[in-house]
Amino acid sequence: MVNEEEKDLTAEGDSNNTGVSPDSIKNKTLDFYPKEKTTERKTRSRERISRKEVNLRFKAYLKSRLFRDYAYIIFAAFLGMASYDYFIAATTSNGITPSGIGGVARGIAVGIWPNQDQLQMQTSMYWVFYFVFNIPLFIFGVIKIGIRFSFRTIVYIGLQNGFHFAFAYIPVINPQELFFIVNYNSLNIFSNYGGMYQIWLFVFAAVAGILNGIAYGLVYKGGASTAGTDFVFAYYSAKKKISIANYNRIVNYIIIVVMLAIHTTLLSRSELTSIYFGKYWAANIEQIQRLGFKIDDGGLYDSDFTSHKIKYFFGPALFASYLFVVVQAITIDIIFPKFKYRSLMVITSKADAVVSGLQYVHYPNDIIRLPARD
């Protein structure tokens, strides 16, 4: 009897004579609030976001690291373009040679378009060559260093090209019409032979070095690099765990010397003569001859041609290019110091193991052990 009663009770519980099944309860819970009302509530919630909250979110985004980094990169690209277009390229084919891949790109552009009336084409093609030369280095950077670093670097190079082609064709402010210091291309070289006109070359180099140094410092702060040899040096610096700043500087100096030597070798008689006596030297041949120079309708010749080539190579163009690199490096150190002094205190009961580990990874700085006092 007891078993039968328990079965009846169980059956009663399972039958649920109330007429409300579990499925109907679930459906009623879901359908209790219609979908239209739920959608209206979501819409009202979204509408409650005030304009003040939107502004606060926008300000928070402006302060975010991503926005700051790309702001650095954009401004750096503009300064880099201004440094080259308005100060380096403005010194014409026989002026300042930038360092790194930029020196190679400028050397090729100058070799193909050497005349002063081809300055705009020469400058534009410099940026094209500079971008193309960095493509294989960009691929190297993606493989060996990382996509984030390499992508930001190629963005920097692309923005420089964009700024150049945007400003090159704007009236009044393009580099052919706007001169921040003097119109170097129009200087009367003949009346200043061996004189003060060369001082302007060093002024242009110093200003270009400052602008380019600021650009490099900002692009480093933005988590990118200036491309070119920076990709290779960044890889070996991380791999070998050593500072390669000195090697980088030496390579840049070598590139300047090599490109200037090639340019000097390729100079024709008329081109070399125009460097020292101006582009209208042919109208002043008699005056130049009275000064004792060997010159004819083709330009300087014989020993004067050779001596002036040597003089050109070891002249203002070389030292102005070095000045550009030095000023650029000093400015970079001010904006983005390579070395920051910090003291680290490690409190440990395993001092021997810590010291051995630091020595194993060739930690370059001093390690001072202070015994604990009771």
UniProtKB/Swiss-Prot annotation:
Primary location group: membrane
Stretches that traverse the bilayer: 70-90, 127-147, 153-173, 199-219, 242-262, 312-332
Membrane topology, as annotated: Multi-pass membrane protein
GO CC, alphabetical: plasma membrane
Protein's cellular compartments: Cell membrane
Keywords: Cell membrane, Membrane, Transmembrane, Transmembrane helix
Stretches with biased composition (Basic and acidic residues): 25-46
InterPro entries: UPF0750_membrane, YitT
ATP-binding listed as a keyword: no
UniProt-listed Pfam families: YitT_membrane
The keyword Amino-acid biosynthesis is annotated on this UniProt entry: no
Region annotation (Disordered) ranges: 1-46
Family under the similarity heading: To M.genitalium MG432 and MG443.
Name the UniProt record assigns to this protein: Uncharacterized protein in fibril gene 3'region
Species of origin: Spiroplasma citri
